């Protein structure tokens, strides 16, 4: 993973979304704007969500494309949206949405690092208290290693 996975340009603190769909679109749009994925990757994120929910627990959802969507991934990357107001994710409250695009099997490494971080409730609380994209990048920066 030579390219940066996460940058302040793909992090939004105090993000707003009225629905799960708006949140997925926002996460996907950040990946497109940064050049990580082709625009139709966002459609594949929605397709994945219809197959299985990307809600993981602890206020976290990790929308990502289907297996077929790998063709639309230019570089592995991640977008992070932190919401003050919870987003209804099929009846679950989500406050952090992490959009993921992985080249080859790199998404598995990214997912593993995120899962470890979010398995600790105090880490989730800390992330929710951060005020800037720079602070979020410092907190989640290990995904770039």
Curated annotation (Swiss-Prot):
Family matches, as SUPFAM superfamilies: Phoshotransferase/anion transport protein
PROSITE patterns: PTS_EIIA_TYPE_2, PTS_EIIA_TYPE_2_HIS
Places the protein is found: Cytoplasm
UniProt keyword Repeat present: no
Chain positions found as Phosphohistidine: 64
Keyword Protein transport included in the entry's annotation: no
Domain PTS EIIA type-2 as annotated: residue spans: 4-143
One GO cellular component term: cytoplasm
Entry annotation: catalytic residues: 64
Purpose of the protein: The phosphoenolpyruvate-dependent sugar phosphotransferase system (sugar PTS), a major carbohydrate active transport system, catalyzes the phosphorylation of incoming sugar substrates concomitantly with their translocation across the cell membrane. The enzyme II CmtAB PTS system is involved in D-mannitol transport.
Domain notes: The PTS EIIA type-2 domain is phosphorylated by phospho-HPr on a histidyl residue. Then, it transfers the phosphoryl group to the PTS EIIB type-2 domain.
This protein's name: Mannitol-specific phosphotransferase enzyme IIA component
Protein source organism: Halalkalibacterium halodurans (strain ATCC BAA-125 / DSM 18197 / FERM 7344 / JCM 9153 / C-125)
Gene expressing this chain: mtlF
